[in-house]
Amino acid sequence: MHQLFRLVLGQKDLSKAGDLFSLDDAEIEDSLTEALEQIKVISSSLDYQTNNNDQAVVEICITRITTAIRETESIEKHARALVGLWDSCLEHNLRPAGKDEDTPHAKIASDIMSCILQNYNRTPVMVLAVPIAVKFLHRGSKELCRNMSNYLSLAAITKADLLADHTEGIIKSILQGNAMLLRVLPAVYEKQPQPINRHLAELLALMSQLEQTEQYHLLRLLHVAAKRKDVEVVQKCVPFLIRNLKDSTYNDIILNILIEIAGHEPLALNSFLPMLKEIAEQFPYLTGQMARIFGAVGHVDEERARSCLRYLVSQLANMEHPFHHILLLEIKSITDAFSSILGPHSRDIFRMSNSFTNIAKLLSRQLENSKADSSRRKTSTEVSIPEKLRELNSMEPESEDHEKLQVKIQAFEDKINAESNTPGSGRRYSLDHISKEERKSIRFSRSRSLALNTVLTNGVSVEDNEVEEKAGMHASISLSQIDPLSHGIGKLPFKTDTHGSPLRNSSASHPSIIHTEPETMPETFKENIQEEILEAATSPIEYQDKLYLHLRENLSKVKAYALEIAKKVPIPDQCTIEDTMRSCVAKLFFTCSLKGHYCLYSKSSFILVSQAPQPWIQVMFLSQQSLFPEPLSIQSGSVQFLKALWEKTQDTGAHSFEVAMTESTFPQQKDLEQLQLHLEEVRFFDVFGFSETAGAWQCFMCNNPEKATVVNQDGQPLIEGKLKEKQVRWKFIKRWKTHYFTLAGNQLLFQKGKSKDDPDDSPIELSKVQSVKAVAKKRRDRSLPRAFEIFTDSKTYVFKAKDEKNAEEWLQCINVALAQAKERESREVTTYL
């Protein structure tokens, strides 16, 4: 052991203890283990708790030892001695006798805890430390337990297996009120599900007492548990989840858990379907997830299939465009599983991708009739088909041409089906060599024949006027079966335009089509039937939505770009456009996505005023598209909102929102750089950062939970040190005065010097600070390379740090403290209201 350590610890000489900090870290590194063992002997003595001299010596030595370990990165070498001293603290009293008064051994435990558990990513250290850390959860003071819980939560991220053996102890601590440890349970559940399952009902009972982040971690635990397909867990958690589904904060997360359960235990949700319908009406944006639950329950048996289909069909007619795809998928999946529900009409109904309202009407009508007609459908079909053949043959003498056409259509359908499963099958067909007159003839003849084909296929007995109407309607339906734009959707078992864009109405939509004499079919039609059908299928009349079509062709690129840009530029939670004297500005509001316990922006917002609103609107549009599995249309609610914002900023004669988004979908690189530069100038990145783990922008505290315990202690300095303050009493004299500043609580304090020229030592109140920023580079000279300014309502302060790195540290800490002050004020207002 180093001679100075031997002197200080052997003789307990407090006067020499301070000299330990004059020694180089490398000089004493080999002595640290022996010094720790000597400290253990001193702290275990009978009179230690009453001997102030011994306590002071031990505290100074531990501070010097932990500093040397950190600087030399030798934690693994000295871990056993550290843990041994830490463990010895458990043999003594750790609970304070008075308020805010730690016992001597609690102080030792706290110092060693931060040294050990900050190395939560080092396995050898954590193997030794975790068993002792769990013991402290039940023996330590409230503050010690809270800090321990923070460190164990970090350890669970990378070393969950080390905590798994202590799951029972962790649960016991949670049930005793240490809810912070709930974040550990999802990580250890895979290793030790049984203890958690045994106490699941008790954990769920805590929900109403928990804070928002703790509730989130409890729901994460249920999601992990649901994936294990344990029947006992399902029975316990489904009623709980349904009860909490009306909470808009969590209903999206809860529905994802219910979808997981519906995948393997659909009957568990059957009795709750009426309640799910009510919630879907209250929160329409949940329709897509609700559809998946109803789709899963609908696969149980035919009775439940009919019940679920009625709900899904009603939603198909009422919901906005983005939900049509998932609704159709679930409807088709159920009708495929129980083919008797729709019978032979299923194929033609689902072909009609150009009108979801009509699909819903047809499905509803068929659901009403199918139950009553199911017993006699076969007989009715056999009788009606010959009658219809005779009736139609009298009107359609050119049956030979019709038969040839059907062969061509079937061949083309087979070809499209084959190509739709092959990568790169988006080949375009054209009829450039055919005249307009021939095209009209082709389209007319094709439509007639497809209408005839549909009536023959359906074979339902109807009156003549009904035949005419249905023939016209189904002629346009059939085209969607060979819609080439649907080839990229591999999940669909049927060919349909899942995006719901109505196709061009052919001449078959007119009721008189069947009674019109067929024109002679040109020879070119026989050679180019595929190209003409494809051209007709991709030429909308009713749905002239260029934005939708553009996004459909570039959806994968748009989503990939949106995901990438979201890491560089944050997406505002709210945006308003305000008129100024010169132009329009965008007022943007940013909040933290996690909203943790110490969140800087859970109740308040970071507000940014931008002189460039259009790039922000463009970024928000791309973000909106990334949230939906299907292309957005100009009629979508979110797009309409962004369009309204765009129009407020639009110059006379400039491109409309739809044109701008189609011609220049992605913002210019220089525009993005300007957005980032502006965010830097307003110090946004001091208080926000992108979390790769969460995939979202979070505030400084939520991104760095390990710092929360230090930052949030009242009176504890957030940062302190020397700064030079510019004296501006006489502006023609450039003079700097050095003071020792401390940023703590809600104030920036400094000590008044002896000179009469020194300002009063009145603190700078953070509540009065309007903004903080670095001195702009264009204003910097040799005297201001690392300066920053603080603006209050009555004064401007200019400070200079020792270097640029130190200036950045001060700026970030001041901005964090400012955000905390505003958040605290916002919470107080909320509480008062």
UniProtKB/Swiss-Prot annotation:
Similarity comment: Belongs to the MELT/VEPH family.
Name of the protein in question: Ventricular zone-expressed PH domain-containing protein 1
Domain notes per entry: The PH domain is required for membrane targeting.
Gene3D superfamilies assigned: Pleckstrin-homology domain (PH domain)/Phosphotyrosine-binding domain (PTB)
Effect of disrupting the coding gene: No visible phenotype.
Compartmental location: Cell membrane
Tissues in which the protein is found: Specifically expressed in kidney and eye. In the eye, expressed in retinal pigmented epithelium but not in the neural retina.
Residues making up the signal peptide according to the UniProt record: none
Keyword entries, A-Z: Cell membrane, Membrane
UniProt xrefs under PROSITE patterns: PH_DOMAIN
Membrane topology: Peripheral membrane protein
Domain PH: 716-819
Entry keyword annotation includes Membrane: yes
A GO BP entry: negative regulation of transforming growth factor beta receptor signaling pathway
Subunit structure: Interacts with TGFBR1.
Keyword Cell membrane assigned: yes
Spans annotated as Interaction with TGFBR1: 201-319, 663-833
Protein task: Interacts with TGF-beta receptor type-1 (TGFBR1) and inhibits dissociation of activated SMAD2 from TGFBR1, impeding its nuclear accumulation and resulting in impaired TGF-beta signaling. May also affect FOXO, Hippo and Wnt signaling.
A single Gene Ontology CC term: plasma membrane
Lineage, broadest ranks: Eukaryota, Metazoa, Chordata, Craniata, Vertebrata
Gene from which the chain derives: Veph1
